[in-house]
Amino acid sequence: MTSILSPEKSQNDQELPLRPSYLQEFVGQQQIKENLSVFIRAAKSRGEHLDHTLFYGPPGLGKTTLAKIISNEIGGNFKSTSGPAILKAADLAAILTNLEKNDVLFIDEIHRLNTSVEEVLYPAMEDFELDIIIGEGPAARSVKINLPQFTLIGATTRLGLLSNPLRDRFGIPMRLNFYNTEELKKVLNRASKLLDIDLTDSGSEEIARRSRGTPRIALRLLRRIRDFAAVNNQLEIDKEIANFGLNRLEVDIIGLDSNDYRYLKFIADNYNGGPVGIETIAAALSEQRDALEETIEPYLIQIGLLQRTPRGRVITATAFEHLKIPLPTSPTHQFNIFNDNE
């Protein structure tokens, strides 16, 4: 799914110059920052490694950035990989044996590790030991290799797909939440100074409130609005040029784009607001289920336009109002049912 509002990382995002290096520079996630500061200081005072840490939550909220900040704060090297990149146990063993004391190993999409790789990871996390099988058949033997004390940081957008044994081995699990408008304004104001952009308070406000609570999206929109300002000979980004650019990008006043409208209108027009199963929606929109669950649905749920129920997806009365579609006479969409993971 391609969209200016996708929270997934893009090769064109070029976030590196904008990434904060230390906790005091990081905007938002205040409780996480405060707790991490305590845990890091305590570990350093004891001369120990920081407990293994798991960041989970929607994409684009700063999981990778926080992992790099932890590495800087504890003074270790930062090694990065991802679950899909570690195909077999030998791949992980090669990474682990090259770690040094206090290094941070960051595994993105850690829920996508296969079982054989996880089994190698367990003793490495608990005892800093690596069990390697040498030889084959009856002559095979297990050799233990001691590893230096390191910190594993995992990141996932799908906590439910993480196996219980792996999840239980993280001493510091932390959920990252969507940002509010004021926090996103701080992110934008910091970035505008680094990018030498003249951003007014009203311009910052306009971009922030349409950024779906996600810093990655806010920074991407800032760069595109900068382009519109430059072509229109605007020396600063104010509310007017921000509104012009965002409308051209088809981002509406609450941060919805054409993909969101397709999703909501499909349920409204074909199922009177739902319930309808996620597989049906994915097939009708020619999208992958994972893309819908990770890119579109979290924000729609966050702002009260969508509910996940045991019977399927249901859009709310607020969604009908935003779509300017009359509310159906059936009260199905108004049921307030517990969320599920369908």
UniProtKB/Swiss-Prot annotation:
Any one GO MF term held by the record is: four-way junction helicase activity
* EC id: 3.6.4.-
Q: Which domain of life is it from?
A: Bacteria
By its UniProt entry, which Pfam families does this protein fall under? Answer: AAA_lid_4, RuvB_C, RuvB_N
Q: What is the catalytic activity of this protein?
A: ATP + H2O = ADP + phosphate + H(+)
Q: Where does Mg(2+) bind?
A: 64
Which key words tag this protein in UniProt?
Answer: ATP-binding, Cytoplasm, DNA damage, DNA recombination, DNA repair, DNA-binding, Hydrolase, Nucleotide-binding
Specify where it is mainly localized: cytoplasm
User: Segment Small ATPAse domain (RuvB-S): which positions?
Assistant: 180-250
Per the record, its GO cellular-component terms are: cytoplasm; Holliday junction resolvase complex
* Ligand binding (ATP): 18-19, 60, 63-65, 126-128, 169, 179, 216
In this chain, DNA is annotated as bound at: 289, 308, 313
Q: Does the keyword tRNA-binding apply?
A: no
Q: Of which family is this protein a member?
A: Belongs to the RuvB family.
User: Its biological function?
Assistant: The RuvA-RuvB-RuvC complex processes Holliday junction (HJ) DNA during genetic recombination and DNA repair, while the RuvA-RuvB complex plays an important role in the rescue of blocked DNA replication forks via replication fork reversal (RFR). RuvA specifically binds to HJ cruciform DNA, conferring on it an open structure. The RuvB hexamer acts as an ATP-dependent pump, pulling dsDNA into and through the RuvAB complex. RuvB forms 2 homohexamers on either side of HJ DNA bound by 1 or 2 RuvA tetramers; 4 subunits per hexamer contact DNA at a time.
The domain section of the record reads: Has 3 domains, the large (RuvB-L) and small ATPase (RuvB-S) domains and the C-terminal head (RuvB-H) domain. The head domain binds DNA, while the ATPase domains jointly bind ATP, ADP or are empty depending on the state of the subunit in the translocation cycle. During a single DNA translocation step the structure of each domain remains the same, but their relative positions change.
Write down the NCBIfam families for this protein, in alphabetical order. Answer: PRK00080.1, ruvB
> How is the quaternary structure described?
Homohexamer. Forms an RuvA(8)-RuvB(12)-Holliday junction (HJ) complex. HJ DNA is sandwiched between 2 RuvA tetramers; dsDNA enters through RuvA and exits via RuvB. An RuvB hexamer assembles on each DNA strand where it exits the tetramer. Each RuvB hexamer is contacted by two RuvA subunits (via domain III) on 2 adjacent RuvB subunits; this complex drives branch migration. In the full resolvosome a probable DNA-RuvA(4)-RuvB(12)-RuvC(2) complex forms which resolves the HJ.
Q: What is the protein name stated in its UniProt record?
A: Holliday junction branch migration complex subunit RuvB
Q: Where is the organism placed in the taxonomic lineage, from the top?
A: Bacteria, Pseudomonadati, Pseudomonadota, Alphaproteobacteria, Rickettsiales
